[in-house]
Design a protein with these regions (language model features):
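PP2C/PPM-type serine/threonine phosphatase catalytic domain
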Residues: 1-121
Length: 121
């Protein structure tokens, strides 16, 4: 049994909502549309970890970011090439997630998310 890649309790993610002060001095609290992901172990392999940052934007951006955050590790674990060709698997997974958004019930017409994902193995 190989040693764990990370010590138990050594990983974490933090995200915080912000605010905006308008030109007339009003304070407007903004919905936090960002999500972070640490999926360990991942891909059904003890030494594989998926890290991700999902920056939601526009209407429903927080929902698109949350949906994408949940779907990336799930779909990567199911992809037949995730261990042998993770670059191709990630490309396929993002295309699948984008195509599945309408059926998810999330209206992403005026919103979405930008993602950065890394697989450490």
């Amino acid at each position: 049994q190989p040693a764990a890649t990370f010590l138990k309790g050594s990983l974490g993610s933090f995200s915080r909502g912000g605010l905006m002060v308008t030109h007339d001095g009003r304070v407007v609290y903004k919905v936090n549309q960002d999500r972070g992901l640490i999926s360990h172990p991942s891909l059904n392999a003890a030494r594989h970890t998926i890290f991700g940052v999902f920056d939601g934007h526009g209407a429903n951006g927080e929902h698109v970011a949350a949906y994408t955050m949940r779907e990336v590790p799930r779909r990567m674990a199911l992809h037949p090439d995730s261990l042998d060709d993770p670059v191709r698997a990630l490309e396929d997974v993002f295309v699948e997630i984008n195509a599945s958004l309408p059926a998810s019930g999330i209206n992403a017409f005026f919103g979405g998310c930008t993602a950065v994902v890394a697989l450490v193995r």
